[in-house]
């Protein structure tokens, strides 16, 4: 995995930094593991915009990813590392000993030809999935479950990981990517290693068109709107006139928006902001 720069033949080319895709296997995606993906343009079933600045973009097919890693005790071989347009990480195609094929998130240091395993008896090496109770303290992990059997939800983006800090009774203590310390049941599965494509954070689109290809539309500032459209709208010049707010009047920039009482509060040992 590396990044590619270009000769400055245009202002966009001068700025652009994109992956070189050297780790990608040259093959079509596995047909049995892709599904149609319908575009919404940020609209809900009523046709109303629920997410602003979405629309257009290149057509995609969804890759069905195995986040549960519930095929226990059967070894699998990595036959390809592939690009997935729906996420920042790369994905790895596994072929199990019984012939079944599944996609997983490709961690760092997982290569074509490697063998991986799921289950309590799996070796501690990148790509293997085990319950937290079977993972040594201090291990770096990703694709961690919140609820046993639900499938991994924590640390799935490119370059992210958690660290197993301690185990006590029914819970394991994790340091989350945000720095938060959180308890998770020890029966939850996690995958060893750091999610691959760690250079994703250094990519630069270089031009507006590349962002449009991803389905993102221009993000209009509130101060550029009329008073009817945004709390920052109107007035002479660019002044807000009051505290920064969202389009719906929610205070921004430092105002805490998390709901007061949640069942998971008792599982958070230390918040990410102290």
UniProtKB/Swiss-Prot annotation:
Does the keyword section mention ATP-binding? no
Q: Which InterPro entries match?
A: NA-bd_OB-fold, Rib_uL2_dom2, Ribosomal_uL2, Ribosomal_uL2_bac/org-type, Ribosomal_uL2_C, Ribosomal_uL2_CS, Ribosomal_uL2_dom3, Ribosomal_uL2_RNA-bd_dom
Keywords of the record, alphabetical order, are: Ribonucleoprotein, Ribosomal protein, RNA-binding, rRNA-binding
- Residues of the region (Disordered) are 222-274
Q: Name one GO cellular component term.
A: large ribosomal subunit
Short name of one Pfam family? Ribosomal_L2
Role:
One of the primary rRNA binding proteins. Required for association of the 30S and 50S subunits to form the 70S ribosome, for tRNA binding and peptide bond formation. It has been suggested to have peptidyltransferase activity; this is somewhat controversial. Makes several contacts with the 16S rRNA in the 70S ribosome.
Q: What is stated as this protein's family in its record? A: Belongs to the universal ribosomal protein uL2 family.
Question: This protein is called what?
Answer: Large ribosomal subunit protein uL2
Source organism: Thermosipho melanesiensis (strain DSM 12029 / CIP 104789 / BI429)
Organismal lineage: Bacteria, Thermotogati, Thermotogota, Thermotogae, Thermotogales
Q: Which gene encodes it?
A: rplB
């Amino acid at each position: 995995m590396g990044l590619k720069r270009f000769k400055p033949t245009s202002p966009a080319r001068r700025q652009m930094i994109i992956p070189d895709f050297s780790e990608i296997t040259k093959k079509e995606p596995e047909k049995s593991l892709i599904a149609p993906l319908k575009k919404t343009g940020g609209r809900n079933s009523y046709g109303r915009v629920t997410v602003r600045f979405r629309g257009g973009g290149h057509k995609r097919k969804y890759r069905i990813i195995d986040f549960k890693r519930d095929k226990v005790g059967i070894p699998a071989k990595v036959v390809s590392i592939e690009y997935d347009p729906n996420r920042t990480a790369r994905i790895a195609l596994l072929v199990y000993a019984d012939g079944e094929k599944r996609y997983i998130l490709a961690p760092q240091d997982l290569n074509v030809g490697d063998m991986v395993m799921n289950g309590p008896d799996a070796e501690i090496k990148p790509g293997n999935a085990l319950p937290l109770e079977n993972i040594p303290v201090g291990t770096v992990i990703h694709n961690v479950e919140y609820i046993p059997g639900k499938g991994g939800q924590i640390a799935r983006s490119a370059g992210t990981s958690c660290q197993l800090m301690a185990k006590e009774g029914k819970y394991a203590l994790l340091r989350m990517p945000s720095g938060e310390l959180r308890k998770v049941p020890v029966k939850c599965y996690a995958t060893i290693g750091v999610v691959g494509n760690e250079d994703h954070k250094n990519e630069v689109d270089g031009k507006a068109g590349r962002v449009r290809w991803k389905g993102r539309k221009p993000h209009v500032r509130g101060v550029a709107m009329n008073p009817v459209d945004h709390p920052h709208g109107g007035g002479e010049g660019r002044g807000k006139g009051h505290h920064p707010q969202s389009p719906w009047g929610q205070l921004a920039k430092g105002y805490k928006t998390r709901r007061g009482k949640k069942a998971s509060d008792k599982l958070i040992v230390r918040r990410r902001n102290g």
